[in-house]
């Protein structure tokens, strides 16, 4: 067990923890001895329920489901030490697509609402339900997983970028509201990462189309041309920093969203 962050026995909720960044965060928290409460639609197959891990099948876009899950966690543990708002969806779309048949890659209401419901409303529902308990405790940490897109915008991802920009605003505003209760609110904005399991061929095809390049050019440009450090980030690099923010070692950090982008995004 790795104990340098002193997260042993902390009760920490991670949304979207079945794959990608979320799974990397879950793995690191478990290595630190935390009691991880993983919220997702699907549980994945790496971890199974036990003393230090519990999977909750919850639709975070439903305020009712979220409250029921948080109530159950509080009933079991009597406290919540940390929340990582990681769950999110992204459907690359252009505002106007005059080239694809029938506007295949044009932003539509269904895609717009799905991204807003998960990425924005889901974070609101989770944070409010958890913050009510943290206010009673006079302690806690909320980490919002944003994106470089939320800091600088992104071609073909306007709605996704807008939802992530909203998270950055949540982080700034909630830190001011909750600081007096001993609650910190912080964010991370990952850049281009190694394949996460969420970047499907369909996703890459759509994103490449919105930028008028090939999938091969997309991959080449991402890793070699756009990042000063010369490589994509590792999931573990994001997870390590998130766990640091959850720990008392970061006790004077609140209200900021930190880039983890290899120098690609500045601001």
UniProtKB/Swiss-Prot annotation:
Binding site for substrate: 147
Parts forming coiled coils: none
Keywords tagged on the record: NAD, Oxidoreductase
Residues reported to bind NAD(+): 9-38
Annotated SUPFAM superfamilies: NAD(P)-binding Rossmann-fold domains
Pathway(s) this gene product operates in, as recorded in its UniProt entry: Carbohydrate metabolism; D-sorbitol degradation; D-fructose 6-phosphate from D-sorbitol 6-phosphate: step 1/1
Subunit organization: Homotetramer.
Top-level taxon: Bacteria
SS bond partners: none
GO biological process terms held by the UniProt record: fatty acid biosynthetic process; sorbitol catabolic process
InterPro entries per the UniProt record, alphabetical: NAD(P)-bd_dom_sf, Sc_DH/Rdtase_CS, SDR_fam
Protein name: Sorbitol-6-phosphate 2-dehydrogenase
PANTHER family xref list: 3-OXOACYL-[ACYL-CARRIER-PROTEIN] REDUCTASE, SHORT-CHAIN DEHYDROGENASES/REDUCTASES FAMILY MEMBER
Gene3D superfamilies reported for this sequence: NAD(P)-binding Rossmann-like Domain
E.C. no: 1.1.1.140
Record family assignment: Belongs to the short-chain dehydrogenases/reductases (SDR) family.
Active site as annotated: 160 (proton acceptor)
Record field: catalytic activity: D-sorbitol 6-phosphate + NAD(+) = beta-D-fructose 6-phosphate + NADH + H(+)
Pfam families: adh_short
Gene Ontology MF: a single term: sorbitol-6-phosphate 2-dehydrogenase activity
């Amino acid at each position: 067990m790795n104990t340098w962050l002193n997260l042993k026995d902390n009760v920490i909720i991670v949304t979207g923890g079945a794959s990608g960044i979320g799974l990397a965060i879950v793995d690191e928290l478990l290595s630190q001895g935390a009691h991880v409460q993983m919220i997702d639609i699907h549980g994945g197959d790496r971890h199974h329920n036990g003393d230090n891990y519990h999977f909750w099948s919850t639709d975070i876009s439903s305020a009712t489901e979220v409250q029921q899950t948080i109530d159950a966690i509080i009933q079991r543990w009597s406290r919540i030490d940390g929340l990582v708002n990681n769950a999110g969806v992204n459907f690359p779309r252009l505002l106007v697509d005059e080239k694809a048949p029938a506007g295949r890659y044009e932003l539509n209401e269904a895609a717009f609402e799905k991204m807003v419901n998960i990425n924005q409303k889901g974070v609101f529902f989770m944070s409010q339900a958890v913050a009510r308990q943290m206010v009673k405790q006079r302690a806690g940490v909320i980490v919002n997983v944003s994106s470089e897109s939320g800091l600088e915008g992104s071609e073909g991802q306007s709605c996704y970028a807008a939802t992530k920009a909203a998270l950055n605003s949540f982080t700034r505003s909630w830190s001011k509201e909750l600081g007096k209760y001993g609650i910190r609110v912080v964010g991370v904005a990952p850049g281009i990462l190694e394949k996460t399991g969420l970047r499907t061929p369909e996703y890459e095809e759509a994103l490449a189309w919105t930028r008028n390049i090939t999938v091969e050019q997309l991959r080449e440009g991402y890793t070699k041309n756009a990042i000063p450090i010369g490589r994509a980030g590792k999931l573990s690099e994001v997870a390590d920093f998130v766990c640091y923010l959850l720990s008392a070692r970061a006790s004077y950090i609140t209200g900021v969203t930190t880039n983890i982008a290899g120098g690609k995004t500045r601001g």
